[in-house]
């Protein structure tokens, strides 16, 4: 039989396989995170009719005479180029811009995917809603009062507990900065109520006790008569209420015996020192820290049977600078900056995912707290991954071991929430390959037809 018959058959068979791959690509043109396949051919073994001969003194060298026996599929590759990103606006949809794979688990088996169309089940677990596979990452933990994520630990299921309560936190530090107008008049001994209002700068802030109950922290500033660049500050928590909270303030770690202190400024309008009623004075440099406290109404007595008091630090800023501190300039009195770290009890209402994959919970009390972080996997040879269906891959002998870490580490891409990665199939390329494949298939068929005709010619010689 003619060798060309079998060459034609191999050509048709392998072009059919290439057409199968193209058809699968076209079918998945709108599949989230799909990566197109590509078929490469190589020639089959060749039959040697005569070997090569080296040149000698009489004649030159002769090349070998070989007849190829057809075509063979060299590889069917998965092309992991970046797909376009589609905006969805859904906060559980996440795409990877760059290399890397999301890590999923089903039982004890680990899968990898580029399709980040995730959702939250009724237990709060972040999953692939199409198959229930659980998204892997690291949950945040409370360590010494801080929320920390240990990305070097073993990955775990990510849980986003919508509706979960967060405990109230009492205020521990109040950072305060303002400008006191140097032009403000001194308060006369016989001043009336209108004069007091005109000569006093009053600021009100909100602080929280251990129950999460909100209290008003009021500080009144007035110039000390007869003394340049000196102001008296009076501190009160919940002023004007029926119950006196017995507010006290002092320099250092002592809350003092009264609720007033003296603020001194230098000739440049910068904070110079603070003196409490006991005569304690702050140092010449560094932060000005005062200890304030007040009675917590409604709290159980302490171990000594005394009224429970809530103590917090009042940070007035740094001596000798105008940045984030109290100043005295000839400008209108203003509160330039204020913040405190207490809050009431709240419920987890929403969450967001940043480029590092950190999931931040947004609570009803305005607090934002880290919940966890998405894990990404990288491979030495991502083309060696085996497809496992449902837009997932599994590790193979030639992919290398999964290197799991956060985004941006060891070449991994960044995460973009509210988007999905589209298929990287280009229909223009696929239809062009389809035409080329069809012509290759037809050429193989033509080879068989021509070989058949030649055999008929040979058989007709006997007639």
From Swiss-Prot:
Record-linked NCBIfam families: FlgEFG_subfam, PRK05682.1-5
Compartments where located: Bacterial flagellum basal body
Keyword Disulfide bond tagged: no
InterPro entries: Falgellar_hook_FlgE_sf, Flag_bb_rod_N, Flagellar_basal_body_rod_CS, Flagellar_FlgE/F/G, Flg_bb/hook_C_dom, FlgE/F/G-like, FlgE_D2, LlgE_F_G-like_D1
Name this polypeptide is given: Flagellar hook protein FlgE
One GO biological process term: bacterial-type flagellum-dependent swarming motility
GO cellular component, one term: bacterial-type flagellum basal body
Keyword Cell wall biogenesis/degradation: no
Domain of life: Bacteria
Pfam families xrefs: Flg_bb_rod, Flg_bbr_C, FlgE_D2, LlgE_F_G_D1
Sequence similarity: Belongs to the flagella basal body rod proteins family.
UniProt keyword annotations, A-Z: Bacterial flagellum
Species in which this protein is naturally found: Treponema pallidum (strain Nichols)
């Amino acid at each position: 039989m003619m060798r060309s018959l079998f060459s034609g058959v191999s050509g048709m068979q392998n072009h059919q396989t290439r057409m199968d791959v193209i058809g699968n690509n076209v079918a998945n043109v709108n599949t989230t995170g799909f990566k197109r396949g590509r078929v490469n051919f190589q020639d089959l073994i060749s039959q040697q009719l005569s070997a090569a001969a080296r040149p000698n003194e009489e004649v030159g060298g002769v090349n070998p005479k070989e007849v190829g026996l057809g075509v063979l599929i060299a590889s069917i590759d998965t092309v992991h180029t970046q797909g376009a990103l589609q905006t969805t606006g859904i906060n559980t949809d996440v795409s990877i811009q760059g290399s890397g794979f999301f890590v999923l688990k089903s039982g004890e088996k680990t899968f990898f995917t580029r399709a980040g169309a995730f959702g939250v089940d009724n237990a709060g677990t972040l999953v692939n809603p199409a198959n229930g596979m659980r998204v892997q990452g690291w949950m945040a933990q409370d360590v010494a009062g801080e929320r920390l994520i240990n990305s070097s630990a073993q990955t775990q299921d990510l849980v986003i507990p919508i509706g979960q309560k967060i405990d109230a936190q009492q205020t521990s530090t109040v950072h305060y900065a303002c400008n006191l107008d140097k032009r403000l008049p001194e308060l006369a001994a016989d001043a009336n109520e209108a004069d007091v209002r005109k000569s006093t700068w009053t600021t009100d802030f909100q602080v929280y006790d251990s129950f999460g109950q909100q209290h008003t922290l009021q500080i009144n500033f007035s110039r000390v008569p007869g003394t340049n660049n000196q102001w008296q500050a009076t501190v009160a928590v919940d002023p004007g209420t029926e119950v006196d909270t017995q507010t006290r303030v002092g320099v250092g770690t002592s809350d003092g015996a009264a609720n007033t202190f003296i603020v001194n400024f230098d000739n440049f309008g910068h904070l110079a020192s603070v003196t409490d009623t006991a005569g304690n004075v702050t140092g010449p440099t560094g932060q000005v820290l005062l200890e304030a406290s007040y009675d917590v109404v409604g709290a159980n007595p302490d171990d000594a049977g005394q009224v429970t008091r809530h103590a917090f630090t009042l940070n007035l800023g740094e001596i000798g600078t105008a940045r984030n501190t109290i100043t005295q300039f000839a400008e209108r009195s203003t509160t330039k900056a204020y913040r405190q770290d207490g809050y009431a009890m709240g419920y987890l209402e929403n969450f967001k995912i940043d480029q590092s994959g950190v999931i931040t919970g947004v609570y009803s009390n305005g607090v934002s707290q880290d919940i966890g972080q998405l894990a990404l996997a990288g491979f030495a040879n991502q083309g060696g991954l085996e497809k496992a269906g449902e837009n997932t891959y599994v590790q193979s002998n030639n992919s290398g071991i999964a290197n799991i870490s956060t985004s941006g580490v060891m070449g991994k891409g960044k995460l973009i929430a509210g988007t999905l990665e589209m298929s990287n199939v280009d229909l223009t390329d696929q239809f062009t390959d389809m035409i080329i494949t069809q012509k290759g298939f037809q050429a193989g068929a033509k080879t068989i037809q021509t070989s058949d005709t030649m055999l008929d010619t040979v058989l007709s010689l006997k007639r």
